[in-house]
Amino acid sequence: MQTRGIRNNNPLNIRYSKDRWKGARTEQTDPAFVQFETMAYGYRAAWKTLESYWKHFHRHRQPFNATTIISRWAPPTENDTQAYIRTVLRLSGLGGRENLPQPSRGVDIAKLERLITAMTTVECGIPYKDVDTQAIRDGYDLAFPGKRSLARTQPPAELLDPETMEELLMWDEYRD
């Protein structure tokens, strides 16, 4: 059975809001999460959300890094935020306080691709190596047309070990 994020083509489980997302299905049947026509449109929404986070953090002179992003994306009122952060850092190889680039600038986007890939693993329970990185790239191109395409990024070899992946995928609260 597919997870909710996969069924909805919304791999980072973006909730309904005032935003009218490009690529949203005409008929929305999920009571909480936006449903998109394609996975690329779901990732487009993720990229646009990250861009809005960058602007918010920049305006408030806060760092834009995996820790601040996930703390806002998956607040402790709804999630085990610290476990989410630890898993994303371990999967992506990013440092928790490592500054990340503004998404729309098209510079060093591979770091953000790794972040989104790891967040997809947490949100959907898909092994990191099986996440559709082409859909992430297509979503980037939909979000920021004309910017540099993403370079393919392979996870560190130790993250592909089946025992490590099994340990990391014990996320029942994030799976349907």
Regions found by a protein language model. Give the residues of each.
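Cell-wall polysaccharide-cleaving catalytic domain and substrate-binding groove, primarily
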Residues: 1-176
